[in-house]
């Protein structure tokens, strides 16, 4: 127990880095995923093909490979072209996590949009709204509510996936645990503490998304008022 208490400040500092990485990745991933998800429904087949190729690539290859590809691969490519280019660990980590997350969020967005009844599109069209206005004012607000549970799952998955950026030396929670074990050699105690912190983070944010889902559900609000 003494070893865990002594290591706790370093592990908590790593946990903060983990949360920051996750928040940035889900933010950029949501922006990219929304664009990709709507593009997947485009009437233009080249757009659909390009977005599907992106999604299949990032969903079909290991995240660890993608991290190495971005952090080591791109600088090597630029060097072969005679250009001096290096990636900051933070930038590479956020980019890899964001690009990967965008591929999964794209399918969440696509599913959310397609879950809206076709009659609502037709009703909006009869009111004089164009496709963009219909998407913005009618479809997306409803689809977003339905996306909250899978987005919550993606967020908790990302928290765990951040541990992979330890391979490029980014000192998030898992990397802090590794460095601590390298100094005190108490692998069982430290990695147990690391696992429990990950669990606590996931439980906390899972509960937050559950609350958000209830808040965004009009039927739940009506029930509360009725009670």
Q: Predicted segment positions?
A:
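Transmembrane alpha-helices and adjacent helix-loop boundaries
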Residues: 1-227
